[in-house]
Amino acid sequence: MSVRDLTILGCSSQQPTRFRNHGAYLLRWNGEGFLFDPGEGTQRQFIFANIAPSVINRIFISHFHGDHCLGLGSILMRLNLDKVRHPIHCYYPASGKKYFDRLRYGTIYHEMIHVVEHPVSKAGLVEDDGRFKIEAAFLQHGIENIGWRITEADTRKFDNQKLIDRGIRGSLVKELQEKGQLNLDGQTIYLDDVSWIRKGDQFSVVIDTLPCQNAIDIARNATLLLCESTYLEEHKELARLHSHLTAKQAALIAKEANAKQLILTHFSARYQNLKLFEQEARTIFANTFVANDLITFPFTKVNLKS
């Protein structure tokens, strides 16, 4: 079984602290590595997490404030140093193309990796490669800023007991799967009679925004929602002034979106006790947890029928 988890490489907003690095988040899912918003120092955090950066094949930048992208150049150079052979797909707001280029080409090195750019200029479907569907929504942060939703493809699952009851095994299973029906002992058995469609899980990221409908929409029905909560509710005016969320507001988004699990991140350096964020959010959305550097959260499969 492939690894399915979310590792918090950093969870601080704007500036790192003694205990929290700039934000960066690695999602390992079905043999792929999705890196979100690599801030300064991300490469070193991989060492502490005991994860090889070569697992990365997709990088997402929500916007081009420094704490969300300053680690991009060093990560690309590290992948180049490691001579990774797979393409590195990079998704970012199209309006930030010049900043992407500055980060990518900010120093002298011979780039040998294959970087595939996906500048996003409109909301909606960005890519569907048959394994994952990637969607974007524009959030409210004063500059162009994107929330992401990644959904795995639906898969068909056989009901083993139904196969046994009908005497279907071995090559007959393959025939049924390929043809959609099977004639056995004078009876026609259809694929739907002995199987069901498992709905693909969904991961959503809402980083740096005021409360808005787009944040709810991109988080809709997320199996796992990673959401910023820069401030506690007692500082909600600061959150409004800087276009951020409080823990309470993040929880309201998760609740309204019908998310299954919420991970809070992107904490202001003014706070030491992150449990306060968890406590505040859980009054509204019980299945809430706080990020902390180098913590790994399991991304558990949810077997829902489509």
Curated annotation (Swiss-Prot):
Top EC class of this enzyme: hydrolase
Reactions catalysed, as given in the entry: Endonucleolytic cleavage of RNA, removing extra 3' nucleotides from tRNA precursor, generating 3' termini of tRNAs. A 3'-hydroxy group is left at the tRNA terminus and a 5'-phosphoryl group is left at the trailer molecule
Active site per database record: D67
Complex and partners: Homodimer.
Keyword ATP-binding: no
Entry-linked Pfam families: Lactamase_B
Protein name stated in the entry: Ribonuclease Z
tRNA processing among keywords: yes
Single Gene Ontology MF annotation: 3'-tRNA processing endoribonuclease activity
Gene source species: Protochlamydia amoebophila (strain UWE25)
Function: Zinc phosphodiesterase, which displays some tRNA 3'-processing endonuclease activity. Probably involved in tRNA maturation, by removing a 3'-trailer from precursor tRNA.
PANTHER family named in the record: ZINC PHOSPHODIESTERASE ELAC PROTEIN 1
InterPro entries xref list: Metallo-B-lactamas, RibonucZ/Hydroxyglut_hydro, RNase_Z/BN
Keywords: Endonuclease, Hydrolase, Metal-binding, Nuclease, tRNA processing, Zinc
Annotated EC: 3.1.26.11
Residues annotated for Zn(2+) 2 binding in this entry: D67, H68, D208, H266
Gene name for this UniProt entry: rnz
Cofactor(s) demanded: Zn(2+)
Taxonomic lineage from the root: Bacteria, Pseudomonadati, Chlamydiota, Chlamydiia, Parachlamydiales
Domain of life per record: Bacteria
Cofactor note: Binds 2 Zn(2+) ions.
Binding site for Zn(2+) 1: H63, H65, H141, D208
Family of this protein: Belongs to the RNase Z family.
